[in-house]
UniProtKB/Swiss-Prot annotation:
A GO biological-process term: L-methionine salvage from methylthioadenosine
Pfam families the record matches: Aldolase_II
Chain positions recorded as Zn(2+) binding sites: 106, 108
Organism lineage: Bacteria, Pseudomonadati, Pseudomonadota, Gammaproteobacteria, Lysobacterales
Protein name (record): Methylthioribulose-1-phosphate dehydratase
């Protein structure tokens, strides 16, 4: 390091490690078709004041280490003058609020986007009775319900973040939808965030398929033996 170079306020080694974790997982989600047209954004807590996050406008299926940047929890770029996602605040608000949260994933699969449009007027999607509800941290039985909030889309992230915070004041949750947009899911690790994301995707797809069936024929409950 020369005399004119200020030390980085975060661990470069840790950033290198997290960049590869992010890239590997994001590539899988991109190949699944959940990040079309450079959409979606992903982050991982770097330390108590910083997060590693995808640079805006990059093809998520072809990310390299330079496509992962650092922001502080005020959403300011740190280390390199790159542009983070316009939705960075929706990541950092979770890191600020929950010290245990280490990963936030935002995707735009067709299932997520269609469900967000279909249920926009209801403000929530109620998932109930599914065995896979146990995929969400804290759930130990299928005999429960998980409500997925559906927020109105807006380009004003301050407004949306305030709405998310207001709901978090009232209930615990592991994700939410934005109308006509996509899904946010998070967890205490990349593995847990992926599990929550995949569980939401599967359960939302089940709900959409049930709606199709109910639209064409009556669904008769199967009696328990």
């Amino acid at each position: 390091m020369n005399a004119t170079t200020a030390p980085l306020p975060y661990s470069a080694a840790r950033l290198h490690e997290l960049a590869h974790v992010l890239i590997a997982n994001i590539r899988e989600l991109a190949h699944a078709g959940w990040t079309p047209a450079t959409s979606s954004n992903f982050s991982h807590r770097l330390d108590e004041q910083h997060a590693a996050i995808t640079v805006s406008g990059r093809d998520k299926g072809r990310l390299v280490e330079e496509d992962i940047m650092v922001v502080d929890f005020d959403c300011l770029a740190v280390g390199r003058p790159l542009r983070p996602s316009a939705e960075t605040l929706l990541h950092t608000q979770l890191y600020r609020r929950f010290p245990e949260i280490c990963c936030v994933l935002h995707t735009h699969s067709p299932v997520q986007t269609i469900a967000s449009r279909l249920y926009a007027g209801s403000d929530v999607i109620r998932l109930e009775g599914y065995e896979l509800l146990k995929a969400f941290e804290g759930n130990t039985t299928h005999e429960t319900a998980v409500e997925v909030p559906v927020f109105a889309n807006t380009q004003d992230m301050q407004v949306l973040a305030a709405q998310v915070d207001a709901l978090l004041d009232k209930q615990s949750m592991w994700g939410y939808l934005i109308e006509g947009h996509g899904l946010y899911a998070w967890g205490r690790s990349m593995a847990e965030a992926r599990r929550h994301l995949e569980a939401f995707e599967f359960l939302l797809q089940c709900e959409l398929e049930l709606l199709k069936l109910r639209g064409t024929r009556q669904v008769v409950p199967v009696p328990h033996s």
